[in-house]
Amino acid sequence: MTEVLWPAAPNGTDAAFLASPGFHWGNSTATSTAAAAAPFRCALTKTGFQFYYLPAVYIVVFIIGFLGNSIAIWMFVFHMKPWSGISVYMFNLALADFLYVLTLPALIFYYFNKTNWIFGDAMCKLQRFIFHVNLYGSILFLTCISAHRYSGVVYPLKSLGRLKKKNAVYISVLVWLIVVVAISPILFYSGTGIRKNKTITCYDTTSDEYLRSYFIYSMCTTVAMFCVPLVLILGCYGLIVRALIYKDLDNSPLRRKSIYLVIIVLTVFAVSYIPFHVMKTMNLRARLDFQTPEMCTFNDRVYATYQVTRGLASLNSCVDPILYFLAGDTFRRRLSRATRKASRRSEANLQSKSEDMTLNILSEFKQNGDTSL
């Protein structure tokens, strides 16, 4: 199924042909005048895949992310005390992922409803805000985890004072403040718009009215909160790998956890973060500067690829729990212990209920005068 959207009206990333205020579509004179005055804009061609691909991905992310991060938060709160510095960062990462997956049911319904948003402008803004808070909060907390592991591997003695839990708490609070302040403009840029067919879109970026300033803002956040952390992470991992090669850490838990950390974080960046930021930037550039008849097919392909990377960007909420399990401090051992304890408690409860049931049956027989037992 292909939906061709009107080129003469703004074509936001989620939808096009929004009705302009005060514009009368039934007036042929006004229509011809506006068409002559308006610059050419490519018609945004929507293929049916986005109505099924994105909700399918979000359903998987919601189920796995909700279960995985719920277990992680439960473990950190009840079974991981006292926390180490890296546990503080991982708890905050799990919290950011959990808050994000809670917003996915509304987004799943939105795409199954043919991108007709019914939850109001405030909920649309909150939806896009939480997505970006999770995106950049996750990147910064992964950077903190990587720097923490780098200090422990490369400078194990010098870093003892710097790796305390108290410092990790202060840094985590600072990360949340930085992310919330940096992402707060999303509350202005995002929002809803009314299409010509009276359905409502929820912009994942912004409308064409604010596109130029949004592009500048997007580039600033991409450089400051994606490119810089990526360079820091790559630097940390390069030095970690070098230390693992030259230091006598064969078969040590620190070596194993460090290798897992490098593999998982680099996989998350390669699959989720890098493609999303590249295609988001290309899509914004296409909307701004590639509006010629010759570029319309290219723009459609960029837009379709960008939609694919939006789904990939949400997968980090599923992958992060694997990080806690493989690279966390004693997480796997304590999870196994907590599971065994819960299993023993369950068996004890079942045995107790069975004994109570047996006693009740015997009591009833005695009351009825049955002496055959």
Swiss-Prot record:
Upper lineage is:
Eukaryota, Metazoa, Chordata, Craniata, Vertebrata
Report whether Membrane shows up as a keyword of the record: yes
Q: Which SUPFAM superfamilies match?
A: Family A G protein-coupled receptor-like
Subcellular localization: Cell membrane
Entry-listed glycosylation sites: 11, 27, 113, 197
| Name assigned to this protein | P2Y purinoceptor 1
An example Gene Ontology CC term for this record? plasma membrane
Q: Which UniProt keywords apply?
A: ATP-binding, Cell membrane, Disulfide bond, G-protein coupled receptor, Glycoprotein, Membrane, Nucleotide-binding, Receptor, Transducer, Transmembrane, Transmembrane helix
Matching PANTHER family: P2Y PURINOCEPTOR 1, PURINOCEPTOR-RELATED G-PROTEIN COUPLED RECEPTOR
Q: Which organism is it from?
A: Cavia porcellus
Q: How does it sit in the membrane?
A: Multi-pass membrane protein
Q: Where are the transmembrane segments?
A: 52-74, 88-109, 126-147, 167-188, 215-237, 261-284, 304-325
